[in-house]
Curated annotation (Swiss-Prot):
Keywords: ATP-binding, Cilium biogenesis/degradation, Cytoplasm, Cytoskeleton, Microtubule, Motor protein, Nucleotide-binding, Phosphoprotein. Residues 552-571, 830-840, 970-979 have a biased composition (Polar residues). ATP binds at residues 308-315. The modification Phosphoserine is found at residues 102, 473, 579, 616, 640, 817, 820, 1008. The gene is Kif24. SUPFAM superfamilies: P-loop containing nucleoside triphosphate hydrolases, SAM/Pointed domain. Residues 218-541 form the Kinesin motor domain. Residues 810-821 have a biased composition (Acidic residues). This is Kinesin-like protein KIF24. One of its GO terms (cellular component) is centrosome. Belongs to the TRAFAC class myosin-kinesin ATPase superfamily. Kinesin family. Residues 473-702 are annotated as: Interaction with MPHOSPH9. CDD domains: KISc_KIF2_like, SAM_KIF24-like.
Length: 1356
């Protein structure tokens, strides 16, 4: 055999190695066949060519041996004479298999080798020869780059020893059946940091330390290898994963070269921790999640999530089994143990929540898969809205909760796993104190398994969607990790719900541990490599976090602040710029407002006249209203551009962050800015100045108005200032040169006209357009105009306003009202305020101007022209004469109304009228302006109305005032707030008819003249606005504005009361609706406004009309009721005034056209819907809200929370002798034009005296005959109203029943108190709903039981 060996070597030109072979014990050819590439260096074969020849020789010998086997020649077992290799037994299988022996096994075998002489080979020589062999075997394979890791010195020996001692190759690794296949070459590839992911980083191992990893690292990446399953072993799957040590992992990937040569690509990965199949969940927990527990007890947050392919062991790791609990259970035990051990932590409790993310949606697994929503709080921390949290006091209970949730989780069969998790499950364990304040939080996330679409078997559409969503979310997670690793300014956390929920796991004071789970099967090699590469990417992030920790920490605006979040932080340093998020109407967001009151940068709109200055008030963007705490002087005469800017930017609302936006907005609405400035300026001084600038800024009214809160005391103190402020609102700061605002620029006018026209068309529903017929109203207005003119002459209000200012303000108002109505409908309260303020400013400002110094004929004419233009543009069909008349009245009415609006609709004004209100309020008192708009329906409806509507409102007010001059004056003039308010209210209630409105306006104006500041406030509220009206109005406006559409809101908000309680009371009584309007000059005025506005403003906004319409019926009813209900001046009005009101009422039918009525009713419903939200407030919405709400809708009543008919004043009125209510209800309920007409007629008919009369709640003085005469409602209509109300009540009750059932199903013993609270709320709503329906039924019965039922029906 030796000769044969020598001959073979000679044939292969390797004869020179024969002596060395024999010296090492190679005597036979069969023994030579056992030589592996690893033995070449030991055999002395170092030359690459010789090695090739030796390899070919061995290959031929093996082929011959296999041929002998095939011929049946018995194979003599080879002795392990070769020191290099020892035959290994391998399991045969149906397919080619890869058998890899672990390095430790190789070492053991080598140790048992007969020859130990090879140990004298130096390690260096072995390494060099080994590398040469690899290079020789695959010299041209660019894919196989042999990257030998240069381990630390401490690990060099062991690592190298492993590589050299383990047989590099063994034929046993490959199927012996493939005799003619070349022996594969193993290529080792080390995946160091940066490998295949971009720029390589130096791979520096962290020196092991006894300290927990949480003290040194932000993210820890571990890998866990599961063992082969029984089924996998049965199928013959091979383990291709080798865990070399606790940080190193090898993956043996079988590959095939282009020439069909098979080779093994050995991937080497390094991680913070590698767990083999022998590791238990306890072992994994101690190295991963255990250090996180101490971190959360230190006040931090922690996340531990498992990632990997379907079936890799993620769920087992995180949730585990009853015998081998998962990480969350082990963590819970640790938490409870620490809570018991530490005395200082005895007052802490453990809360658990469990939800999943399935197909991009969140579901609560502890609450019957209730749909959840992920939102960010003010600190940009993600909160899960609606998530059910359970308090657990033991690990057993916690395990039961998790078990319950696990049963609800979405799972499904896939091609890889029969029970695969198809959703991401998040178990959140929180530590809270007795006040339920979160002390620490740890989340365990079991991610859904990633998979390839090619692996899916028999997948239907749902399965494909699941897989796509899972992969998309995991990809988004990878993108977030990449962005964080590369320190991008933007991290796409919102690309998926998963990343949104996990956002806090990667930023801020959060520690994260990722456990990559892998399967050992060779079939899953590709999945395993993808998982390991993914984890390696996170490991790089971990390293990057250390480097950029300072960058992350430097943004400490919040505990969890990302660079992006920090950049967008709402807090702006003085002088810092904050670009608005939105640019409105092409306005440039060039205006930057610094917190400092004086520091402001303003860039005029392209359309804005450059000469119009922006002023900043002392108010800082961060403050809601600098005037709030500051004395009036702060606002005095300060033409601070900033104020206007701030207001525009809604700085009051949003604070410093909004300041930038405010700047932009203020640019957009310089008029608004001016209004704010006016407010800022002393109410008395700045009125004129502010108004003047307002003209110049009217282009900017397009911008939404920001609310400014003024202290109620200041408002009360400076009622007059309030009015002046309103005017000043309209105008620019007193400090600004009036000439800049004196001459409106053509561009501004065109802009205003365009915006007005656009908003009118945009906001008017086709129904309203068809029904609008303002001719009659205009005629009425014209008829009443004389009285208004008289009133004007009589009531020279000491308002400081320039006709120019007024004009500017008017134009501005028009634009603002239009724009605010259209685009700044925030509850329409802001727009309404803006409109109202503009309208008020316009009419009010001009009115103030007139009052200040009675407008010269020229000024009045100019104002009228503006008003007419606006009205005509807005109303279209309206007659110019009426408009002009209205406007001519407007100055007075405006002033009154402006003052009234300010005082009585502070809330409304505050939100939407913020500039007006702020100016007024700022002068008098910032807090008066709180966010609530005055309830004044006039103001509100004006705001919501287009500028035309505002004019109409003004006209109505003026008409009402002029018509009821004596009464109004009497009541208004009376110093008592009640008188002032009550009279206007009654007039307002009556204001449904232009005459009535005029009357009210006149008295109000006169009163205002007598006590401009006080009367308007009183008019706005029963008591002077300064006293209670501000708060009430604010509340009302807040409710109305938030809940209603811009127009509807304004109408609803318009009604303002001196006292919310009084308003609520009135609403409860059923008079509240009308009462509010009346008090504010709203329901009635608002209602009246509907009539007027229907003529003048209907074109502007059907919604506004609707509000008015709804207000007027309720107003009528409430008006009657109001006197009885509240101590408001309306009630106080003596019956003698009632006749006058009745007269006004008679006029009202004329004022309100049927079309208007119908449209109002239509809008009213819409309003009601909106109001419904506001009405829902536990406290009854201000009557103005009620007024805005359709009285016929039961929902409103219940929502309003005033079952008495607050929601449905008309119902209450029905209860009262007033015959109006039933018919009103029908008309309001009916969307048909006839019904509206009837309602309008009723409104016209309804006796103002009722509203004004304080003696009788329903003012019986209004005869049912008169009501019937004016607005007869047929019994059929009344029945229809009742039927409809009953149906609505049934629907609402059904909805409440459903809520109650849902609440019962969700009842939890741990939260029984909360359950009782919610149940009580539901019962209260039911009670209100029932009471509302009963009110309507009683009203119907009172109207139809008497013999004179027809009359009452008509009235109703």
């Amino acid at each position: 055999m030796a000769s044969w060996l020598y001959e073979c070597l000679c044939e292969a030109e390797l004869a020179q190695y024969y002596p060395h072979f024999t010296a090492l014990g190679l005597q036979k050819i069969d023994e030579l066949a056992k030589v592996t590439m690893k033995d070449y260096s030991r055999l002395g074969v170092h030359d690459m060519n010789d090695r090739k020849r030796l390899f070919q020789l061995i290959k031929i010998i093996k082929i011959m041996q296999e041929e002998d086997k095939a011929l049946g020649i018995p194979e003599h077992p080879l002795q392990a004479s070769s020191l290099y290799t020892k035959p290994r037994e391998f399991r045969s299988g149906p397919r080619r298999q890869l058998h890899f022996d672990s390095p430790s096994a190789s070492k053991d075998k080598m140790a048992n080798n007969e020859t130990g002489s090879l140990s004298n080979f130096s390690v260096d020589e072995q390494k060099s020869t080994y590398l040469k062999v690899l290079e020789h075997m695959l010299p041209d394979d660019s894919q196989c780059q042999t990257k030998i890791r240069a381990p630390d010195a401490s690990a060099a020996d062991a690592s190298m020893q492993t590589e050299t001692n383990a047989p590099l190759f063994s034929s046993n690794y490959f199927s012996p059946q493939l005799g003619n296949c070349d022996i594969p070459v193993i290529q080792r590839v080390s995946h160091v940091s940066g490998y295949n992911y971009g720029i390589p980083h130096s791979c520096v191992r962290q020196i092991t330390s006894e300290n927990p990893w949480t003290e040194m690292e932000k993210i820890r990446v571990c890998v866990r290898k599961r063992p082969l399953g029984v089924r996998e072993v049965r199928r013959g799957e091979v383990n291709v994963i080798t865990v070399e040590d606790k940080e190193t992992l090898l993956v043996h990937e079988k590959k095939e070269a282009v020439d069909l040569t098979q080779y093994i690509l050995q991937h080497v990965f390094y991680f913070d921790e590698v767990f083999g199949e022998a590791c238990s969940n306890q072992d994994v927990y101690l190295k991963t999640a255990h250090p996180l527990i101490q971190h959360i007890f230190n006040g931090g947050s922690a996340t531990c999530f498992a990632y990997g392919q379907t079936g890799a062991g993620k769920t087992y790791t995180m949730i585990g089994t009853h015998q081998n609990p998962g990480l969350y259970a082990l963590a819970a035990k640790d938490i409870f143990r620490q809570l018991k051990v530490s005395q200082s932590r005895r007052n802490l409790f453990v809360w658990i929540s469990f939800y999943e993310i399935y197909c991009g949606q969140l579901y609560d697994l502890l609450n019957r898969r209730k749909r959840l929503f992920a939102r960010e709080d003010s600190k940009h921390v993600v909160q899960i809205a609606g998530l059910r949290e359970l308090q657990v006091d033991s690990v057993e209970l916690l395990l039961q909760v998790i078990l319950k949730g696990s049963k609800e989780r979405s799972t499904g069969a896939t091609g890889v796993n029969a029970d695969s998790s198809r959703s991401h499950a998040i178990i959140q364990i929180q530590i809270k104190d007795s006040a339920k304040r979160t002390f620490g939080r740890i989340s365990f996330i079991d991610l859904a398994g990633s998979e390839r679409a090619a692996d899916a078997r028999d997948s239907d559409r749902q399965t494909k969607m699941e897989g796509a969503e899972i992969n998309q979310s995991l990809l988004a997670l990878k993108e977030c990790i990449r962005a964080l690793d590369q320190e991008h300014t933007h991290t796409p956390f919102r690309q998926s719900k998963l990343t949104q929920v996990l956002k806090d796991s990667f930023i801020g004071n959060a520690k994260t541990c990722m456990i990559a789970n892998i399967s050992p099967s060779h079939i899953a090699t590709e999945h395993t490599l993808n998982t390991l590469r993914y984890a390696d990417r996170v490991k790089e992030l971990k390293k990057g976090v250390k480097c950029c920790a300072s960058a992350t920490s430097q943004n400490q605006t919040s505990a969890n602040a990302s660079p992006k979040r920090i950049q967008s932080s709402p807090v702006t340093l003085p002088g810092d710029k904050c670009s608005p998020k939105k640019v409105k109407l092409g306005l440039q967001q060039s205006l930057t407002v610094a917190p400092g009151p004086t520091k402001v940068k303003a860039h005029p709109l392209a359309s804005h006249v450059p000469n119009v200055p922006f002023t900043s008030g002392p108010k800082t963007p961060g403050k809601k209203s600098s005037s709030r705490g500051s004395p009036t002087p702060e606002w005095d005469m300060k033409a601070s551009p900033r104020k206007g800017t701030t207001r525009s930017g809604h700085s009051i609302k949003k604070g410093a962050e909004s300041a930038p936006l405010c700047s932009e907005k203020s640019q957009i609405g310089s008029k608004i800015a001016v209004g704010w400035e006016g407010r800022a300026s002393d109410p008395g001084e700045g009125l004129l100045r502010v108004r003047l600038p307002t003209r110049g800024k009217k282009v900017q009214p397009v911008q939404p108005v920001q609310k400014q809160l003024l202290s109620r005391p200041r408002l009360l103190a400076n009622s007059h200032h309030l009015e002046a402020t309103q005017d000043s609102k309209v105008g620019t700061p007193a400090g600004l040169a009036p000439e800049a605002w004196t001459n409106p620029i053509l561009q501004q006018k065109e802009r205003e006209e365009h915006l007005r026209f656009y908003h009118q068309q945009f906001q008017q529903p086709p129904l309203l357009k068809q029904k609008l017929n303002y001719q009659p109203l205009q005629r009425l207005l014209c008829q009443h105009r004389p009285s208004e003119g008289r009133l004007q002459s009589e009531t020279g209000f000491p308002l400081h306003s320039n006709p120019e200012n007024r004009d500017g303000a008017q134009a501005e108002d028009l634009d603002d009202s239009d724009f605010s109505e259209d685009s700044f409908s925030h509850g329409s309260s802001q727009p309404a305020m803006k409109q109202g303020s503009t309208a008020l400013e316009r009419s009010g400002s001009s009115f103030f101007l007139h009052q200040d110094r009675e407008h010269s004929p020229e000024e009045q004419a100019a104002e009228r022209q503006q008003c007419l233009l606006f009205s005509s543009e807005t109303d279209g069909s309206k007659k110019r004469p009426a408009d002009s008349w209205v406007y001519s009245r407007d100055p007075i009415i405006s002033h009154r109304r402006g003052a009234l609006s300010q005082s009585h609709s502070p809330s409304m004004v505050c939100p939407d009228w913020s500039k007006e209100e702020d100016s007024a309020s700022s002068g008098p008192s910032p807090k008066d302006n709180r966010a609530q708009k005055p309830s004044s329906s006039q103001v509100d409806f004006v705001h919501h109305q287009k500028p035309g509507e505002a004019q109409v409102s003004d006209i109505r007010l003026e008409a009402f005032t002029s018509e009821v001059p004596e009464q109004a004056e009497g009541s208004l003039s009376s110093p008592s707030p009640e008188n002032g308010l009550s009279f206007p209210l009654s007039h307002v209630a009556v204001s449904g008819s232009p005459d009535q409105r005029d009357r009210v306006c006149t008295p109000l104006r006169e009163v205002s003249e007598n006590r401009v500041t006080h009367t308007p406030g009183r008019v706005n509220s029963s008591t002077p606005f300064q006293e209670d009206s501000g708060e009430q109005i604010q509340m009302c406006s807040a409710n109305a504005s938030g809940l209603m559409a811009p127009l509807t809101m304004s109408l609803l908000e318009t009604p303002c009361h001196e006292d919310l309680s009084s308003l609520e009371q009135i609403a409860q009584d059923g008079a509240g609706y009308g009462f509010m309007a009346e008090i504010v000059g709203g329901p009635a005025a608002g209602h009246t406004v509907p009539s007027y506005d229907q003529e003048a403003a209907l074109p502007v906004s059907s919604a506004t009309e609707c509000l008015w319409l709804s207000s007027s019926p309720p107003d009528n009813r409430p008006s009657g009721d109001l006197p009885a209900l509240s101590p408001s001046p309306i009630h106080q009005h003596s019956p003698d005034k009632l006749p006058g009101r009745e007269a006004y009422q008679t006029r009202r039918p004329i004022l309100l056209p049927e079309n208007h009525m119908g449209s109002k009713l239509y809008d009213d419903r819409a309003e009601e819907t909106e109001l419904g939200g506001s009405l829902t407030f536990p406290r009854k919405p201000s009557s103005n809200i009620h007024a805005g709400v359709p009285y016929s809708t039961p929902f409103l009543t219940s929502c309003t929370g005033s079952s008495n008919g607050v929601g449905r004043p008309w119902a209450q009125e029905r209860k009262h002798p007033t015959g109006v209510s039933c018919q009103e209800l029908v008309s309001s309920t009916d969307s048909n034009k006839p019904h509206y007409n009837e309602d309008i007629a009723w409104l016209r008919h309804r006796p103002i005296s009722r509203c004004l009369d304080s003696d009788s709640p329903v003012v019986p003085s209004c005869s049912s005959k008169a009501l019937r005469t004016y607005c007869p409602l047929t019994p059929e209509q009344a029945q229809q109203v009742i039927i409809r109300a009953h149906k609505e009540q049934l629907d609402e009750m059904a909805e409440l029943d459903l809520k109650e059932e849902t609440l019962m199903t969700q009842m939890d013993s741990n939260d029984f108190e909360d359950f009782v609270t919610q149940l009580d709320e539901i019962m209260a709503l039911k009670s209100r709903c029932i009471q509302s329906l009963r009110s309507q039924l009683q009203l119907y019965l009172t109207s139809h039981r008497p013999a004179a039922a027809p009359e009452r029906t008509v009235v109703s």
